[in-house]
Regions:
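N-terminal chloroplast transit peptides
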Residues: 2-25
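Glycine-rich adenosine-cofactor-binding loop
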Residues: 75-94, 396, 415
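Glycine/serine-rich phosphate-binding loop and adjoining beta1-alpha1 elements at the start
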Residues: 28-75, 111-112, 229-231, 245-257, ...
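NAD(P)-dependent Rossmann-like dehydrogenase/reductase catalytic/cofactor-binding core
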Residues: 35-62, 221, 282, 290-536
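Rossmann-fold dinucleotide-binding core
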Residues: 174-270, 328-329, 358, 370-400
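NAD(P)-binding Rossmann-fold cofactor-contacting core
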Residues: 47, 95-126
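Rossmann-like NAD(P)-binding element
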Residues: 112-113, 122-181, 189-207, 213-215, ...
């Protein structure tokens, strides 16, 4: 059965309930008062200072695997439902970690009847014969922990049937707050008689698996994760959520709420994580050619400069290190680009946050799901920019990739604008830095560096790739129309904007997060059991 057709049919009634004139949730600031109050009798909870605030985190590592049996106490069967971006990685990581910990817990995959993903699941060791692969509702009925990792749009279409199929006392596990946002928007909520938790890796699924595999000899590596305990009827939900994160290989976990998570996550991927960086590269590629560069050099000075130099500095030394490493004219060029780009980028980013917080962006995803049978997801790397990029990558010399100061100014300005919108909305530093910095430089940009923008975007979720395609052109347009023309017309550098960047407290938070980064750098070209997508 064609998934696009099936999803479109399932969403018909869901979209009607979630029509544009439906009551939307009020845009609200995220309260920090509900966070940083968790405790654990199993894992060590650390207090970390992020800029002017203190937050609680749990640091992961393979040395914690012996604690997993206690964290998963009472869980005998886990059902991982779906096989999209996150499910293949999380299912394999959980299976491997629980086995290493000596847990007698069965991890099963649940899929739609007739799904083409059955074969992909078999290829990595799940099977009907071993009772680790089956039809989704059969698996849901058996599971003590239901990890609902089907697409957000499918969750919105099927949530009633899924809740009804869950056995009494089972825990619902999510990796995104989207379903909460959807239910909130239509005046509904999760059933009161179940635990509802979330563990949300701050990176695409393939990177969750790749870093787990590559970090086996360094006490584990993976992708940082947020966790949320939305309902705790059993009194064990926090320990289970933390155990889930440790089993995934998360270097550290920080607390959030489902509401804060979906606002920051949906917003972030439309911004610097995916949509904005796509728009930045396209606009700079054209600009540099207008200035006389060859197509190949224009790609080097735009995309390659971001993924091969700028993001690597940010990953290990922080955002400000990019600026501090420049001298003389290069630093002045950075200031011009940063000053001109900050407010135009922030204008779009504030619009995105408002659209997400109001429920409008959730409606976009739901409605796109309804249209997908008629209008399948298309390629985004057919433009001259990305075609030239294939040639550049084939001839690449990593040691000679430039750090273009203008490119750096535009990219860093957009990243900082994204950070400021989240901070102004009340999100904690741990969430802000992970959704604006760490995920970009440690999970996503390495994929664009390896194979281009489509390889990065299309290995993310349906929600992410929908939003990236929608908002990338907006960044492309506003930077071209407002930022670059301001520079070309000789508009003076706004020293207040530069001063705010130089003294921003987020630099302290990023510095602290750099200490908690994965123990290895991701290698995208090495062998892996992860599922990765290329749209032909």
């Amino acid at each position: 059965m064609n998934f696009s057709f099936a999803l479109g049919a399932l969403l018909a009634t869901s979209v009607a309930a979630f029509a544009p004139n439906a009551a939307a949730p009020r845009a609200v600031s995220v309260s920090k008062s509900t966070l940083n109050a968790f405790s654990s009798t199993i894992f060590d909870v650390r207090e970390v200072k992020f800029a002017e605030t203190e937050e609680l985190i749990v640091q992961g590592g393979r040395d914690l695997f012996p604690l997993l049996p206690k964290a998963f106490e009472g869980i005998k069967e886990i059902g991982v439902i779906g096989w999209g971006s996150q499910a293949p990685a999380q299912a394999q990581n959980l299976r491997d970690s629980l086995a290493e910990a000596g847990c007698d817990i069965k991890v099963r995959i649940g899929l739609r009847e007739g799904s083409s993903s059955f074969e992909e699941a078999r290829e990595v060791g799940f099977s009907e014969d071993a009772d680790t692969l089956g039809e989704m509702y059969d698996i849901i009925k058996k599971s003590d922990l239901v990890m609902l990792l089907i697409s957000d749009a499918a969750q919105a279409a099927l949530y009633k049937e899924i809740f009804a199929a869950m056995k009494p006392g089972a825990t619902l596990g999510l990796s995104h707050g989207f379903l909460h946002g959807y239910l909130e928007s239509i005046g509904e909520d999760f059933p009161e008689d179940m635990d509802v938790i979330a563990v949300c890796p701050k990176g695409m699924g393939p990177s969750v698996r790749r870093l787990y595999e590559q970090g086996k000899k360094t006490n584990g590596a993976g992708i940082n994760a947020s966790f949320a305990v939305h309902q705790d009827k059993s009194g064990k939900a926090t320990e289970l959520a933390l155990g889930w994160g440790v089993a995934l290989g998360s270097p550290f976990m920080f607390e959030t709420t489902l509401g804060s998570e979906y606002r920051s996550d949906i917003y972030g991927e439309r911004g610097i994580l995916l949509g904005a960086v796509h728009g930045i590269v396209e606009s700079l590629y054209r600009r540099y050619q207008r200035q006389g560069m060859s197509p190949e050099e224009a790609f080097n000075q735009s995309s390659e400069s971001i993924t091969g130099n700028i993001t690597k500095i940010i990953s290990t030394k922080g955002i400000k290190a990019v600026y501090d490493g420049l001298e003389g004219d290069d630093k002045e060029i950075f200031k011009q680009a940063y000053s001109a780009s900050y407010m135009p980028s922030k204008e779009i980013l504030q619009e995105i946050y408002d659209e997400v917080s109001s429920g409008n962006e959730i409606r976009t995803v739901i409605m796109h799901g309804k249209r997908i049978a008629k209008f399948p997801v298309g390629k985004i790397d057919g433009t001259d920019c990305w075609q030239v990029g294939e040639k550049v990558r084939a001839e690449r010399d990593e040691e000679s990739i430039p750090l273009n100061p203008f490119t750096a100014g535009v990219y860093v300005a957009t990243m900082m604008a994204q950070i400021d919108v989240l901070l102004e909305a009340g999100h904690p530093y741990s969430e802000v830095v992970n959704e604006s910095v760490i995920e970009a430089v440690d999970s996503l940009c390495p994929y664009m560096h390896y194979r281009g923008v489509a390889f990065m975007v299309d290995n993310c979720s349906f929600t992410a790739k929908t939003g990236s395609r929608k908002w990338a052109p907006r960044f492309d347009y506003i930077l071209d129309q407002l930022a670059y023309t301001a520079v070309d017309n000789g508009k003076p550098v706004n020293e207040d904007i530069i001063s705010a960047f130089e003294s921003h407290r987020v630099h302290e938070a990023v510095e602290e997060c750099c200490k908690l980064r994965p123990s290895v750098d991701i290698s995208v070209d090495s062998a892996s059991s992860t599922k990765e997508i290329v749209i032909e």
